[in-house]
Amino acid sequence: MAANKVIFEHVIQPGTGKAVEVRAGQILRIEQVEGGQCVDFNCFNLNDYKEFMHCGRTRTVHGFHPSKGTFLWSGPPRERAMMFILEDTYGRNDVLFPRCSAYLYESAYGFDVHTNCQDIQAEAQREYGLTPDDVHDSFNFFMCTEVSGPHRAQITRQESRAGDYVDLLALIDVLAVTNVCGADVMRTSNFSLKPLRLSVRPATDAERAAAPPTPILRSQRTPESFRVRNIKADRELRADPTYRPEFRNVPLTVEDVAVELSANEMAALAAVRQPIYGDDDGAALRDVLFSWWEERFLAGSSGAPVISNKADSP
């Protein structure tokens, strides 16, 4: 099959969404038809729906506004790169704000009936047997947000145009669920709702090679390592009478290490110590030590994995 041959195409209208199977090595394109439309996007492992795109993990690794050259990650315990943003012509996306919901529009705007991303997502993924409880927070493509002050973020108007697009390379088989964000009373899509075009095609060798390798670590868990492998089939929670705790890495041990400081060193500690520790010199010194270690030796910011671009490899 030719790498540029489109194998699926669909226009999603306002108020709707579409669940699409995208196999590893294929590219999903999400394209503006008229421009100015926010996209709520989610994806699941096609072979295990319990693994899905996790905004929190993606935000930790790539920041508030991931764009071209970043990944969509699943959450713990899998923590895998599921898709790679191969191209992003507008370059404004968001993983700060959650999906909008019917409750939001009734509580904040007084609309007891209103199109919303929760309901659209739930209906689109119902084709694959997933319930409204299986909806999770969206990756918001073409959504402009900013941190506006202490403890606050805000949505701003956007300037995407007809023909702007995002290309997502599937790294594993995924069910990609895209919907037209239902927020027509917010700046999200400039107070309007417009259609979007989806298409799927095979990636070229060069496009597949563009995604840098991500680490495969022993600490990543898969269902094979779970002590409970079967998914619960009922909704009520009941205690397992045969349960015996088997926590990892316990029992924990704490060892005191004596550290002698000179008068000058004590003065230096006093100058940088955090006041929260009061008179506890040991806690203050431990904070200084680990803060120093973080700044110099932590592999990635905020505990993010190190991702080396192939072009940077010797």
Predicted segments, located by residue:
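Short hotspots in intrinsically disordered terminal tails
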Residues: 251, 310-311
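Hydrophobic beta-strand residues in large extracellular and virion-surface proteins
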Residues: 28, 176, 198, 259-261, ...
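Short Lys/Arg-rich basic patches
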Residues: 244-268, 273
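Amphipathic alpha-helical interface segments used for dimerization/assembly
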Residues: 20, 28, 273, 289-293
